[in-house]
Amino acid sequence: MKKVLIMSSVHPWNDTRVFHKEAVSLARLGYDVTLYAVASNHVYEGNIPNLRVVTFAPKSIAQRWKTWLQLYKIAKRSNAEIIHIHDPELLPLAYLLKRKHRKKVIFDMHEDFPAVLKGKKIGKMRMPKWLLRVVATTEKKMLQKMNAVIYAEKYYKENYESLTTKQMDIYNYPFLQEPTDILKYEKQTLIYAGAIHEIRGFKEMLAVAKLLKKANNDFQLLIIGKVPQRLEIYAEQFIQKHDLEDEVKLLGRLDLHELMTYYAKSHIGLAILHPEANYLRSLPTKIFEYMSVSLPYVLSNFESYGRLVEETKSGYVVDPLSPNEIASQIQVLLDNPSTQAELGANGYKQHVANFNWSVEERKLGELYDGI
């Protein structure tokens, strides 16, 4: 049985892609898998054959180097046939493992790294172009040494056309879901799950809740994910000021199985991301999760999102920076349960036909078999 070592210094051990999809799939395909990742508010019960999980406490950015060193020492001593690395900050580690220790290494790209860098700041200044070029050149040289590079989005590889190493697209599609008969919440329920940040529409969602309450709607907004302290304070003040205690619920981070139940019981999914470079062409996983439980949704009006909505007829797009427009489109859905049902059914058909993990699992197995 081939041994696989999976490592992340950023993601919690029960991350949907890292654990539930890739690690579990590899164990099911017959690999002996060990995952090193960040501890979360859930504990692995050790109930999956061939899969071991080792966690470490999350560290601040300033202290993250200690985790990198720890993972490097573990990996270089490991007898795993394949090492699967998940974070850009661990790419130098992956490069050293390949060049210095002759390990077989896969790098898994979750985001459009060049676009992310363009949005970063040093103090109050954007990263200078010369530094972006240096980082991009260095990144490509390191990626070229990998045994394989995995892309979570099809367009990512447009930045790496010069690479000749093995490459494969493995998308974040949800597990194939059976039609659900779970009862919906009595209140019309809006739901968002994922990273919580200003640029992911957190403040706009609260503003929308205020507008919907002002229009006398009986609803609730569930926001699932770890809320940074600054936004937790903002939310508490906003909720109290506008008397939204009965409407807005911040539920913290949930495990995937719990999350899917919340989705299934809700009425409308939200993905109101701001027009940041890393988001414009990258379809959020949550859209496909919404489809898998027949949940209609409201998305940002980016070109790639608009194409998906046009092709699938399963949701609506709006200006993500306009709470009034977002609230108006949600109001249309709240007032028309039959439209909710029609859009949800369209999305589920697409989930079964095109957007589920089964195909991606086969691709992952083929990639591993070829290394």
Where are these regions (language model features)?
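A short, well-ordered alpha-helix in the C-terminal region of glycosyltransferases
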Residues: 325, 332, 339-354, 363-366
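Conserved acidic donor-binding segment of nucleotide-sugar-dependent glycosyltransferases
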Residues: 311-312, 316-323, 332-338
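Acidic donor-binding loop of glycosyltransferase active sites
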Residues: 263-280, 295
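Conserved donor-binding/catalytic core segment of Leloir-type glycosyltransferases
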Residues: 5, 150, 182-209, 222, ...
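Donor nucleotide-sugar binding/catalytic pocket of nucleotide-sugar-dependent glycosyltransferases
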Residues: 52-54, 129, 135-179
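Nucleotide-activated donor-binding/catalytic signature segment of Leloir-type glycosyltransferases, i.e.
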Residues: 225, 233-260
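N-terminal strand-loop element at the rim of the active site
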Residues: 6-20, 24-64, 73-78, 155-161, ...
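Membrane-proximal helix-turn-helix segments that form the acceptor-binding/catalytic region
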Residues: 24, 69-76, 96-100, 113-116, ...
